[in-house]
């Protein structure tokens, strides 16, 4: 593979905030990678109040060619003005990397050749925008809860998947730590994401936006571990707030989708958020009345999609309960 030695081929985005108990696992997952190309990890500590920054300094000293730290003295996420994303975007741009990988500070990689396998796939097929893999699920202590989560794509079949396929997946999401995407159309992607910016939904909107530029390849291998962390942003947000945010974000995503996805936009406006809202608000009975009108509209506009989404959600809920 021809490589410009002035720039790493891959840049890893790693956001850290009070991840001290888990951070070594995360950073070890970076430095064990076996590749025939250079890569860097932009590790951004958002003014942690624990010893996360000390751990990052330790690894940056030991692996200066890989670990590229950013230390904040003021928490950027709490500003809610996009500062956190802008800092990371500037750092990624400065690397000149061709591909971007992702891993939050409380998750970690388990496969030493994860990056190499993903790069090989992207280099071989220019129609691909990203490569995603499966993940295991662990608890706060690192105990494996699920060896292979599954459901990343329909029937776990390895291959290429479109945006339409994404909306038909059982999980309706990709494991963040498993994703590597092509670093192209950066300004257009950021403009689209700015229109849909919302902290409740993690990278859900990013997957959708990336899909509008190309297919995802699903590599049917476990390369990462997703940690169930009750102190993470998505676990600490109140259910009512998340339900309302999901409706807002579905409408925003519908606004930015290209015209060939008009049917998906219609589904997003009238059905997709309904099931998620029901799940987020299931302990708040009064919120159901707030959604009755929208439910009726969804039944009129997109009955098949509504019933499909609800049946998929019920199936996921039953499978999750069966594993407990």
Predicted regions, residues:
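Acidic helix N-cap motif at the loop->helix transition within catalytic regions
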Residues: 22-24, 50-59
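Cell-envelope/extracellular polymer assembly enzymes that use nucleotide-activated donors
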Residues: 8-11, 40, 205
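A conserved acidic beta->alpha catalytic loop
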Residues: 45-54, 74-75, 104
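Short aromatic/hydrophobic "clamp" motif used to bind/position activated sugar donors
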Residues: 100
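Glycine-rich, basic loop-to-helix element that forms the pyrophosphate-binding segment
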Residues: 73-95, 117
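Conserved nucleotide-sugar donor-binding catalytic segment
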Residues: 85, 93, 133, 151-239, ...
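Conserved donor NDP-sugar-binding/catalytic core segment of glycosyltransferases
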Residues: 113-147
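Short, acidic, metal-binding catalytic loop of nucleotide-sugar glycosyltransferases
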Residues: 28-38
């Amino acid at each position: 593979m021809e490589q410009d030695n002035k720039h790493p081929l891959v840049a890893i985005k790693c956001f850290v905030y009070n991840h001290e108990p888990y951070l070594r696992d995360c950073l070890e997952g970076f430095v064990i990678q076996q590749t025939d190309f250079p890569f860097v990890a932009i590790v951004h500590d958002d003014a942690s109040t624990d010893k996360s920054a000390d751990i990052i300094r330790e690894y940056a000293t030991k692996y200066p060619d890989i670990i590229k730290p950013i230390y904040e003295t003021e928490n950027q996420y709490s500003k809610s003005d996009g500062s956190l994303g802008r800092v990371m975007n500037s750092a990624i741009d400065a690397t000149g990397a061709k591909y971007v990988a992702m891993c939050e500070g409380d998750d970690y990689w388990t496969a030493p050749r994860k990056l190499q396998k993903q790069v090989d796939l992207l280099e071989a097929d220019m129609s691909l925008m990203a490569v995603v893999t499966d993940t295991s699920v662990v608890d706060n202590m690192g105990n494996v809860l699920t060896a292979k989560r599954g459901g990343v794509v329909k029937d776990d079949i390895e291959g290429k998947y479109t945006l339409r396929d994404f909306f038909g997946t059982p999980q309706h999401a990709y494991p963040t730590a498993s994703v590597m995407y092509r670093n192209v159309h950066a300004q257009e992607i950021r403009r689209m994401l700015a229109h849909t910016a919302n902290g409740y939904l993690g990278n859900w909107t990013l997957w959708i936006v990336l899909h509008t530029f190309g297919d995802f390849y699903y590599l049917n291998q476990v390369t990462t571990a997703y940690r169930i962390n009750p102190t993470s942003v998505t676990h600490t947000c109140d259910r009512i707030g998340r339900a309302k945010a999901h409706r807002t974000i579905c409408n925003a995503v519908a606004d930015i989708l290209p015209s060939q996805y008009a049917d998906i936009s219609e589904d997003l406006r009238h059905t997709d958020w309904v099931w998620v809202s029901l799940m987020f608000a299931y302990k708040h009975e009064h919120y159901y009345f707030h959604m009755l009108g929208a439910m009726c509209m969804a039944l009129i506009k997109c009955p098949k999609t509504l019933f499909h989404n609800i049946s998929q959600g019920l199936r996921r809920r039953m499978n999750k309960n069966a594993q407990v």
